[in-house]
Amino acid sequence: MAPPSVFAQVPQAPPVLVFKLTADFRDDPDPRKVNLGVGAYRTDESQPWVLPVVRKVEQKIANDNSLNHEYLPILGLAEFRSCASRLVLGDNSLAIRENRVGGVQSLGGTGALRIGADFLGRWYNGTDNKNTPIYVSSPTWENHNAVFSAAGFKDIRPYCYWDAEKRGLDLQGFLNDLENAPEFSIFVLHACAHNPTGTDPTPEQWKQIAAVMQRRFLFPFFDSAYQGFASGDLEKDAWAIRYFVSEGFELFCAQSFSKNFGLYNERVGNLTVVGKESDSVLRVLSQMEKIVRITWSNPPAQGARIVAATLSDPELFKEWKGNVKTMADRILTMRSELRARLEALKTPGTWSHITEQIGMFSFTGLNPKQVEYLVNEKHIYLLPSGRINMCGLTTKNLDYVATSIHEAVTKIQ
């Protein structure tokens, strides 16, 4: 008799919530259905948008007979890495001028986080420091916890961020957690357009955060998934990172080009490393090269070529900034329209937070039972946390969504 399958005892893993939501939406035959869960940009026709500048560059690449399919270097396409780091740190960055910046091309922002996490677990402030506390905001993007856990970190803690009552930043709680964290702890910070709350510190608040972090020797690991997409202004969205660098911090920054280039399935990311001197950055990169070699070995070329070609050409760069602003402006419009409708309906509660938050997501303040009502009764799909993607709203479904939220809030406590 043959033995049972060696996989017989493997338990079924729960589905990834945001992708299950999209699958449920797709299978729903109801014509009223609205998907507010998807983590990607949509046009006013609810369609994905390929940026015109990306189409143009793809055509140029297709017609360039000098290009081939040879392996890229382990750390990635050199032009892409330097352009990506320059985009986040700025053209006049002192750190770049002093050659103490490095980049690692990664498989999206998640890949950048994972390479950074693996490196920190092995080499941060000594060797094999997986007991170093990792602090992530409460709430945060669910993958932050998962990535650092998978990298072997044993002590992952939340820090205060969201004040549910006032629907804004809990600055005092945040500062208290910084003060009480063990020295040399690692803090994962959202550079802009905080996911899921859409609430960012102001520049003055960032200065207070940086001052405590510097005094307590805390290490900033920025996640920058939305540069340009948050406010429509590339410089403004990178302000926090640039300020930390100007204050002399060593830091990591995981960058994603999924949202601001619309290159979701090309997996284009970069891990920017800022050190105190060029020698240490070179040593860091040498160790990251070893980590990449056993992770994906060599990154893909197409997305990196598109980004590098766009960022290095003044005309294409200008066109790209216009494309990004188109996306950011549509989101801002949807925010103000949704708020106006809820206020016109006299929906209980305050709704000013919808326009005060920025980026793709809004933390509505809806509770899980109200969300359940919207999903089951109204066929409006959103996460149990009440997070909605503003891009799921269109001029055609705004009224329906607003009246449905009004019903949920008035009927269900």
Swiss-Prot record:
N6-(pyridoxal phosphate)lysine sites (modified residues): 259
Pfam family, one: Aminotran_1_2
Main location: cytoplasm
Domain of life: Eukaryota
Tissues and organs where the protein is expressed, per its UniProt entry: Expressed in neurons of the retina. Localizes to the inner and outer plexiform layers, the inner and outer nuclear layer and the outer segments of photoreceptors.
EC number: 2.6.1.1, 2.6.1.3
Keywords: Amino-acid biosynthesis, Aminotransferase, Cytoplasm, Phosphoprotein, Pyridoxal phosphate, Transferase
Chain sites annotated for binding L-aspartate: 39, 141, 195, 387
Enzyme class: transferase
Gene3D superfamilies given in the database record: Aspartate Aminotransferase, domain 1, Type I PLP-dependent aspartate aminotransferase-like (Major domain)
Protein function: Biosynthesis of L-glutamate from L-aspartate or L-cysteine. Important regulator of levels of glutamate, the major excitatory neurotransmitter of the vertebrate central nervous system. Acts as a scavenger of glutamate in brain neuroprotection. The aspartate aminotransferase activity is involved in hepatic glucose synthesis during development and in adipocyte glyceroneogenesis. Using L-cysteine as substrate, regulates levels of mercaptopyruvate, an important source of hydrogen sulfide. Mercaptopyruvate is converted into H(2)S via the action of 3-mercaptopyruvate sulfurtransferase (3MST).
UniProt subunit comment: Homodimer.
The protein, known as: Aspartate aminotransferase, cytoplasmic
Organism expressing this protein natively: Mus musculus
